[in-house]
């Protein structure tokens, strides 16, 4: 690692700052270097992308220049861009992100798509189903992105969102408040879904009263840790990454809890790891589940398993 702040020129324009930032990140083989440099410059300037490209000759003042290249050096050392800016977009919404939560990924948006489709509340924003008072659970909520996106799409839904991490729940609560859905989400500290039955009683719901249980559980195997990108392995919370030695161990207890929580006809939606589709399909072959489906993401990778609870 040889990253360091470059010599400060007398003046530095927006376009020159981007050029120099990209070059420094590329020297350290940072993925998506141009995007990272853009986001960090936007953050340092307090401006959006449109402003940056509309003002390429704008000169950075010394304090902004110093902050920007400090951020570039931190990103070059492996710190995720989202931890430096404190933000990540998900489902068109801006989420606060800290090292206490998994950074929301674009592929997790497929969980929202499948959930809405399985509930009959899909792409038509005017669908009467979107006004139904759905009862939902988001297990392992992290930043709250799944629960908050669902609450944003379904204005009468009420959601119980769980996480083992008190620090993650604090981030999720702030995100819920940011998006004006805090009154419809109960945040509960517990491991996976093990305490969700108790949580449902404490928030006034009966067991088997949920219309949906959604989760992006930790599904990476411990044996895969060394192969993860440095920014993931060193900077994201282990409890949100690893689901056991193989990464598939997390699904059996989660599916068992879902069977106890979902009402007849209720829907289970789970994000899948790269090697977990066959294992999850096998678990959902058990009595009690019907309409089992695997949905691929845009890259053609099995990404989401869904099923319906029968009587």
Feature locations, PLM:
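Non-catalytic nucleic-acid substrate-recognition regions in nucleic-acid-modifying enzymes
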Residues: 1-33
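Conserved AdoMet
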Residues: 2, 34-35, 39-118
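Residue-level signal for inorganic ion chemistry
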Residues: 40, 78, 108, 146, ...
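Conserved SAM/SAH cofactor-binding pocket of Class I
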Residues: 109-227
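Class I S-adenosylmethionine-dependent transferase superfamily signal
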Residues: 115, 150, 232, 254-258
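Helix-to-beta-strand junctions that scaffold the AdoMet/dcAdoMet cofactor pocket
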Residues: 181, 236, 262-264
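Mobile active-site "lid"/loop adjacent to the S-adenosyl-L-methionine
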Residues: 219-250
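Conserved Class I SAM-dependent methyltransferase catalytic core
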Residues: 245-308
């Amino acid at each position: 690692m040889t990253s360091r702040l470059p010599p400060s020129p007398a003046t530095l324009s927006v376009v020159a700052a981007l050029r120099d930032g990209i070059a420094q990140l590329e020297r350290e083989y940072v993925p998506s270097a141009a995007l990272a440099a853009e986001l960090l410059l936007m953050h340092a300037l307090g401006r959006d992308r449109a402003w940056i490209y509309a003002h390429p000759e704008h000169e950075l003042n010394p304090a902004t220049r110093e902050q920007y290249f400090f951020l570039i050096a931190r990103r070059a050392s492996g710190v995720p861009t989202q931890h430096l800016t404190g933000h990540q977009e998900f489902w068109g919404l801006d989420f606060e992100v800290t090292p206490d939560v998994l950074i929301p990924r674009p592929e997790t948006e497929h969980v929202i798509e499948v959930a809405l489709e399985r509930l009959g509340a899909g792409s038509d924003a005017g669908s009467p189903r979107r006004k139904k008072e759905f009862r939902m659970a988001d297990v392992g909520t992290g930043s709250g992105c799944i629960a908050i996106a669902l609450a944003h799409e379904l204005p009468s839904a009420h959601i119980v969102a769980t996480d083992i991490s008190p620090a993650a729940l604090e981030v999720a609560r702030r995100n819920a408040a940011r998006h004006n859905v805090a009154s419809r989400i109960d945040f509960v500290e517990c491991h996976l879904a093990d305490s969700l039955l108790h949580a449902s009683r404490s928030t006034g719901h009966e067991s088997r009263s949920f219309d949906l249980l959604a989760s992006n559980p930790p599904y990476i195997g411990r044996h895969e840790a060394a192969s993860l990108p440095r920014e993931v392995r060193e900077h994201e919370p282990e409890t949100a990454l690893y689901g056991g030695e193989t990464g598939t161990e997390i699904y059996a207890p989660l599916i068992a809890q879902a069977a106890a929580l979902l009402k007849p006809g209720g829907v289970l939606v789970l994000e899948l790891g790269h090697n977990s589709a066959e294992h999850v399909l096998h678990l959902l072959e058990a009595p009690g589940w019907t309409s089992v489906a695997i949905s691929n993401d845009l890259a053609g990778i099995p990404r989401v398993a869904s099923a319906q609870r029968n009587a």
